[in-house]
Amino acid sequence: MKNRKYDLAAFMMAVLVGAAVLFGCGESSGAVSKEEPLTVYLWENSLIKNLVPYIHEQLPDQDIEFIVGNNDTDLYSYMEEHGELPDVITVRRFSGTDAQDLQPYLMDFCGYDVVSRYYSYALQYYKNSDNEIQWLPVCGLPQTIIANKTLFDQYGIKIPSNYQEYAEACQQFYENGIKPYSLDLAEDWSAHEVIQAGAIGEFTSLDGIEWRSGAETSSREVKFDDGLWKRIFSETSRFLKDSHLGKDDILVNADIAYQTFVEGKAAMFHGYPALMQQLQTQMDAQLICIPYFSQTSEEAFVYMTPSLNIAFNKDLEKDQEKLETALDVLDCMISEEGQRLIANGRCVISLNTNVPTMMQDISGLEDEMKSNSIYIRYSAQKSFSASLEAIHGLLSGEMDEAQAYDAFRSAMNAEDTEEKAVVNFDREYSIALNDKNGRDAASSILTTVRVENNAQLAIAPYYYFTASIYRGECTSSRVALMTAKSSDTSLYFAKINGEQVWKLVENYLDHTEDEFSITNKYELPILSGMKITVQKEENGFLLKDIAVDQEKIDKEKEYSILLTDDTRSILEKTTPGCRIKRLPDMTLSSAWTAFMEKGQQPLAPEDYIEVEK
């Protein structure tokens, strides 16, 4: 077993002398306690498809259950209130303020050597008010301006290397009838980015760093430095004007902004390098990344979003074997291959001293990467809606800089409105596997949505269901968190015969998509209106039987079936030409939430699966 813990004094001395203890991912340090698996919640389902197979490959003898959560720490607060905080939790949108109610229940990483493998800048905002590090970022994704270099060259416009040149380039494109910057300002994340990236010189100044440190550890009202924030909104306003962004851009969503850039009607867009590579395949143009420029100096910075932030349940320290397994999982995540898989490509900023940054195919950021000129996004939940309100006020002309700052500050410090309960659950259903390898909470949710949409059958991947249904009153927002809202799926309706149902289920069990396939009991699908019997084999599961109404499925009979994005895709392959109808304005999460908002009880879970050994 690896000795991963050491006292804080020794750790600080190691940091001072520049020592770092390096560990690989592949060596397993011990099995999980036999009673229960290690539960790891990943904030979106792409991580289930990309990362989980790699971790299982590295740690084949360890009992680990991966479940998709949500990009919201309130999910984990809800689970903790009912005594079910998972062993390992992750989110992308994160600030210390949002996670304060979890602070008593999370482990401090400061006593473990994993902290010594991080660059100091990566952890500067991760210490809480007790000087503990309870969350760690796992690799970063650079969010930059994406420039159409071919368009720049066509009009003889220089690729900017400072803010003044950026403003001049925007003006030249505007005079030539080309939109300088296509930005999806209908989206909260883009409004959020404009404030921090447009005034990035202020956020990276000593005043900005001091404010950020205080904001991350604030337990109540976030204090604002008026001098700093007046400068921030002055520079934000200037950035919007210099970029020729105005009232019409309030309604520009991600699809519109993307298409405008693809069609060559705009010179610049924004996004991660992986998006730039995707754009490159669609455009007959050379693309290049541009960093965000300080308006107060010649400096430029890469605006970075951690791909995920991870925390451990404090109770892990009471079970050394389970803790070692959790640390093994973390080792896998921060390994070179783990970071590449998390970032879904090669373009990733490593935050760890023993793993190189992987930006080989991206040009335009070389100087900033070499000098570690990286700004980590501030991501308090309230800051997104606050940014949207302030930016829309500036764009519409309804607010000047001072009013926009006042609106932002007020929104950040507004007291949370007490949300009223919409349903009082009279029963409790667990998301954990039952003794037949089914998930009662997931079954209840899927069955409720199926019946509400008048379908006889339904099949869905397990990773669309996140939390137990707890007895008692529940608000609408927490009802929504019982499904993977951050990785939601559309719903589809089809009519197929029993033989086609068999092929659909059989192929789902065999299906490999993006290197993800069902290899263990935790990954089995959720079904409703039917019961399947499967046999465990060395590399997966074999379908043995399907029963409907306790009788073997009729291969000739037609059945209506409710599908998700993934199961629809499989049906299109197994039954080409099958008519599949997308249910309008409906997702799994919205359908479930809407039904519960009526105040009715969910339907009981079904006995939908049996695993033969």
List each model region and its residues.
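Conserved N-terminal structural module of periplasmic/extracytoplasmic solute-binding proteins
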Residues: A19-G96, I159, Q403
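C-terminal capping/gating helix-and-loop segments adjacent to ligand/active sites or protein-protein/ligand interfaces
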Residues: S46-L47, E65, M304, A343-T417
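Extracytoplasmic/periplasmic substrate-recognition and gating elements
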Residues: E57, Q280-N344
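A structural signal for short loop-to-beta-strand junctions that line the ligand-binding cleft
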Residues: Y78, P86-D87, V115-T150, K179-E187, ...
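Hinge/lid segment of periplasmic solute-binding proteins
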Residues: R92-T144, K158, E193-V194, I288-I290
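Extracytoplasmic/periplasmic solute-binding protein
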Residues: Q134-P137, A167-E221
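Glycine-centered hinge/linker elements that transmit conformational signals in sensory
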Residues: G214-I250
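Catalytic centers of hydrolytic enzymes
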Residues: E418-K613
